[in-house]
From Swiss-Prot:
A motif (DDXXD motif) lies at residues 525-529. This is Isopimaradiene synthase. GO terms for molecular function: magnesium ion binding; terpene synthase activity. It is an enzyme of class 4 (lyase). InterPro entries: Isoprenoid_synthase_dom_sf, Terpene_synth_N, Terpene_synth_N_sf, Terpene_synthase-like, Terpene_synthase_metal-bd, Terpenoid_cyclase/PrenylTrfase. It holds the Pfam family Terpene_synth_C. It comes from Isodon rubescens (Rabdosia rubescens). It is found in: Plastid, Chloroplast. Abietane diterpenoids (e.g. miltiradiene, abietatriene and ferruginol) accumulate specifically in the periderm of roots. The ent-kaurene diterpenoid oridonin, main constituent of Isodon rubescens, accumulates in leaves. Keywords: Chloroplast, Lyase, Magnesium, Metal-binding, Plastid, Transit peptide. SUPFAM superfamilies: Terpenoid cyclases/Protein prenyltransferases (SSF48239), Terpenoid synthases (SSF48576). Ubiquitous expression in roots, stems, leaves and flowers. The keyword Transit peptide applies. Pathway: Secondary metabolite biosynthesis; terpenoid biosynthesis.
Length: 775
């Protein structure tokens, strides 16, 4: 498979005291011992992860938001007493040793400054703190104040607007901060620039004070009484305008969290979607599939109701769209129509949703396009991809983890192979991860030790299994004497590709059958193209068609004998394994599929030698079949633990799946190799279009790209559709994984010819330790 006319080189080989724990901080250093202790308790880990999916969403306290709630006055006492004194108690009890509040991190000093100044304000306003507590806080702000204008510091949303205003509040309260006046001037200049540049600033209205019409701000009030689900903004509104719903919202928070509030509430829907996304991205979703389905069903119900838990947050909306569509739920891109261009996006979304992480989610949503869609997702893809590329080029993504995610997704989205994605996501998974809104917060529901341990175990199990199976493949190669045949030894590459198609470690037989088939296709493709005569090629086809016993044949050459004997033995072995699990013989099906592939290879051979090349339609009638997609996939489907009937394999659905994946990969191949193949006088769809229609190379490549996109959309539609489908979804996913392989190999270069990235990915999967010992 993926082998026609290619030259394969030689194989290369917390935030705060309440939520802080030593196991969180020092986890990476103790990971190895933790995993070793858990190796025999995987079922316990699965139960814990299931509880994470079903249980309450956990979130860390926000010193910043708790401080704003603490500033709300009690109306019954003419505003001379705090409405929420318990928040004041929490502030007093949770100052860090260095005088700050909030996360202590050298890259998040702006966060610390914002939290610390916010906490000093209610302490000063209500005069409840000891002088030393205030002095320590003021000293921290003074000593760290230079970070307030440091562009290399990660900035909370609205910092440049809110922090200067809090300085003004401090002055009004006669709280002397001892800040350099030049620095203060710069901060207020930056604030004015932000106010001029940005629209939709209601999310950070606490930084606008009396300059904003709070009645207009309250027009953004949500059904739960909050403003943007932000305790700080809601508290600020309550300070400026008494509103019963705002008060009820804050009361509800304190009934839940008792003495503090988070920076966002509620966030159940978003957190659960993030959790599902992470579990899928780490490859451990199969352990909690029923629980994930419950989450998606509830999300779809909210989607249909246009619930504000989804639709008031662009990030959540985009993620919900992608996850639901990829699982076959009927969602249309109309709901993303407000974000079709950059101008519309920034004019539509609130300040909280205007960051790079939101644009990345929109970019990923734009990739799940179906044939019936209008141009919404294409327009969305155009501007989000340009925006993210510009962010990478300008090096303005200060969050290194987010930067790596953007780079990984932007490089070749459809070419991200599952097993590679799982491993790279694991390397990025950090149980101390903090998302930045107005303040940094942790969500242990999404980032936790249970998921990390379960994934580590799974990846180590996979790696051990992969190494064993590679040894089996090498022995098979030697037993079949294929190492004696001229051509590309594609064992390592073939196995790597199918390991990505079947990442579940239990699917050993499916992986091996697939890998052996791809390896044989590669050898035979080289034989037909370069090392054998037409007569020898026809002989191999005749022997397969008649299913002749290898020992009864008089062979014209050792290579013909080795190739046919290997084919006969491998087909027999695969058929026997399928019979053992399915109770029916598919040998005739495998032979038929081999004849189809070899006939297509012969057609390629003849087209290269013909005086008149085939036209485009004639070429596309045989060239996609020479890749052997159905030959590689269909036998393997019988070894995946699903009951596969003959009717399934011969269904129109299966035919269409094979057609679209084969055509798309053939065109991806041709698009990348046409310049070389034109010099070699090898038939290629790009050159056929150029010659037949007398069009430029650029126009031909553009037409081919549109065809690739068409067949990719059609394939995805078949994979995700539920109604009328006869193949199990697990089986249809193999066709989708296969097109990912095509994008991986041919989207930007011919990786069979220049396999540098593939070398790195193979090393990562097969050899690099899953857990790295920290010094």
């Amino acid at each position: 498979m993926f082998s026609s006319s290619l030259k394969l080189k030689t194989n290369p080989l917390m935030d705060n005291k309440i939520h802080r724990s030593s196991s969180d901080r020092d986890f990476r250093g103790s990971t190895i011992s933790s995993v070793k202790c858990s190796l025999n308790n995987s079922e316990d880990l699965i139960v814990k992860v299931r509880e994470r999916v079903k249980g309450k969403v956990e979130i860390s306290p926000s010193a910043y938001d708790t401080a704003w709630v603490a500033m709300v006055p009690e109306r019954d006492y003419s505003g001379q007493k705090p409405r929420f004194p318990e928040c004041l108690d929490w502030i007093v009890e949770n100052q860090n040793a260095d005088g700050s509040w909030g996360v202590q991190s050298s890259s998040m000093l702006k966060h610390s400054l914002s939290c610390t100044l916010a906490c000093l304000l209610p302490l000063r306003k209500w005069n409840v703190a000891s002088p030393q507590l205030l002095r320590n806080g003021v000293e921290f702000i003074r000593s760290s104040s230079s970070a307030a204008t440091d562009k290399n510091q990660i900035s909370p949303i609205g910092f440049d607007i809110v922090f200067p205003m809090m300085i003004q509040y401090a002055n009004d309260l006669n709280l002397e901060l001892l800040l350099n006046q030049d620095l203060v001037n710069i901060l207020f200049q930056n604030r004015e620039a932000q106010l001029t540049r940005n629209k939709n600033l209601e999310y950070v209205a606490e930084g606008l004070g009396s300059s904003i019409d709070w009645n207009k701000v309250l027009m953004h009030q949500r059904s739960n009484g909050s403003l943007f689900n932000s305790p700080a903004t809601t508290a600020a509104a309550l300070i400026h305008r008494h509103d019963k719903k705002c008060l009820e919202y804050l009361n509800s928070l304190l009934s839940i969290y008792k003495t503090w509030v988070p920076t966002i509430h509620p966030m159940d829907v978003y957190a659960r979607l993030c959790l599902v996304d992470h579990l899928q991205g780490l490859g451990v979703d199969r352990f909690v599939h029923p629980e994930i389905e419950v989450v998606l069903q509830e999300t779809f119900r909210l989607w249909q109701q246009k619930d504000d838990k989804i639709f008031t947050d662009a990030t959540c909306r985009a993620m919900a769209f992608r996850l639901l569509r990829m699982q076959g739920y009927h969602v249309t891109p109309d709901e993303l129509g407000g974000y079709v261009d950059e101008e519309s996006f920034f004019a539509t979304v609130s300040f909280e949703s205007s960051g790079t992480d939101t644009v990345l989610e929109l970019y990923k949503a734009s990739q799940v396009r179906l044939p019936e869609d209008d141009d919404t997702l294409e327009k969305l893809h155009d501007w989000t991809s340009k925006f993210l590329k510009q962010k990478l080029q300008s090096k303005t993504i200060l969050d290194q983890q987010l930067e790596r995610k953007v780079e990984f997704n932007l490089k070749n989205y459809h070419g991200i192979l599952d097993a590679v994605k799982h491993r790279r996501n694991f390397d990025l998974y950090d149980i101390d991860h903090r998302r930045i809104l107005k303040t940094a917060y942790r969500c242990p529901t999404v980032y936790n030790e249970d998921i990390l341990l379960l994934t580590a175990q799974d990846l180590m199990t996979r790696q051990v299994q992969n190494q064993k199976e590679l040894q089996i493949m090498e022995r098979w190669l030697e037993d079949c004497r294929l190492d004696k045949v001229s051509g590309r030894n594609a064992v390592l590459v073939s196995y790597f590709l199918n390991a990505n198609n079947f990442p579940d470690p239990r699917l050993s037989e499916a992986r091996l059958a697939y890998a052996k088939t791809v390896t044989l296709i590669t050898f035979l493709d080289d034989f037909f193209d370069h090392h054998g005569s037409r007569e020898d090629s026809l002989l191999i086809m005749e022997l397969i068609n008649k299913w002749t016993e290898p020992l009864t044949v008089s062979y014209p050459s050792d290579e013909v004998e080795i190739l046919y004997s290997a084919l006969h033995a491998t087909i027999t072995d695969t058929a026997e394994k399928v019979y053992a699990v399915q109770g029916r013989c598919i040998k005739s099906l495998i032979i038929e599929l081999w004849m189809e592939v070899l006939t297509a290879m012969l057609g390629e051979m003849d087209s290269c030698n013909a005086d008149t090349p085939p036209d485009f339609d004639e070429y596309m009638a045989f060239a996609p079949k020479s890749l052997g997609c159905s030959l590689s996939i269909l036998p393997s489907l019988h070894l995946m633990g699903e009951t596969i009937s003959e009717e399934m394999v011969t269904s129109l659905e299966c035919f269409e799946l094979d057609k679209h994946v084969s055509i798309a990969i053939r065109l991806l191949n041709d698009q990348q190799t046409f310049e070389r193949e034109r010099k070699e006088r090898t038939t290629n769809s790009v050159t056929l279009l150029m010659d037949a229609d007398q069009i430029s190379e650029e126009e031909a490549v553009s037409r081919i790209q549109k065809l690739i996109e068409h067949h990719t959309k059609e394939l995805l539609k078949l994979v995700v559709q539920k109604e009328g489908s006869v193949l199990p979804r697990k089986c249809k996913d193999i066709f989708w994984n296969t097109i990912k392989v095509g994008y991986c190999l041919y989207r930007f270069s011919d990786e069979f010819t220049s396999p540098q990235q593939m070398k790195e990915d193979m090393k990562l999967l097969f050899h690099d330790p899953v857990l790295k010992t920290t010094p």
